[in-house]
Amino acid sequence: MFLQSQKLWTMLLILAIWSPISHSLHFDLHSGRTKCIAEDIKSNSMTVGKYNIDNPHEGQALPQTHKISVKVTSNSGNNYHHAEQVDSGQFAFSAVEAGDYMACFTAVDHKPEVSLSIDFEWKTGVQSKSWANVAKKSQVEVMEFEVKSLLDTVNSIHEEMYYLRDREEEMQDLNRSTNTKMAWLSVLSFFVCIGVAGMQFLHLKTFFEKKKVI
């Protein structure tokens, strides 16, 4: 059991190291429509996002039909970003609560309908810290930058392991609760079946007695 648990945590650690923690998306959005994108974020994690509408006529200003409203909310409904009638923007915040965060894009209503092409990049954790912007040319500063990046990566993996462990404990509690409820339901179903069978037996007995069969 211990070896299996150790192997499980090793696999989770490898996945945490290699799994992507940023999303770069390109999608189309029609006039008057809304598209939402979810991201599972740990509490106290930094997250940044930026978005823009592709310009179909490069070098010219975007028409008024090419505007969107953007809203980023937590699973409990708290608002972290809200922009109206924009063609580009960005957001950054530290997640207060763990869970799914939703970024919803709504295109302005227009007739005839137009299609907007939107680029959206969402980074969480280590990748949200733009270390490349603070890296310098000197060898010492480059080494310091690499060490800080590695420390951030290690801390992120450490936090991810604790987060996964907490999620695993929550799932185990849910499974135990579900099994208990299923056991009670099985017992209740058994007594219901016994009761129905008894009622049928009494009904048949009364019926046959009236018919003088027994």
From Swiss-Prot:
Intrachain disulfide bonds: none
Chain ranges on the Cytoplasmic side, renumbered to this chain: 203-214
Signal peptide: 1-24
Glycosylation sites: 175
Residue numbers bearing the Omega-N-methylated arginine modification: 167
SMART domains tied to this protein: EMP24_GP25L
Topological domain spans for side Lumenal: 25-181
Coiled coil: 164-177
Domain named GOLD: residues: 34-149
PANTHER family the record matches: TRANSMEMBRANE EMP24 DOMAIN-CONTAINING PROTEIN
Description of how the protein assembles with itself and partners: Probably oligomerizes with other members of the EMP24/GP25L family. Associates with the COPI vesicle coat (coatomer). Associates with the COPII vesicle coat (coatomer).
Annotated family: Belongs to the EMP24/GP25L family.
Function: Involved in vesicular protein trafficking. Mainly functions in the early secretory pathway. Thought to act as cargo receptor at the lumenal side for incorporation of secretory cargo molecules into transport vesicles and to be involved in vesicle coat formation at the cytoplasmic side.
Note: The lumenal coiled-coil domain is required for the Golgi subcellular location.
Protein name: Transmembrane emp24 domain-containing protein p24delta10
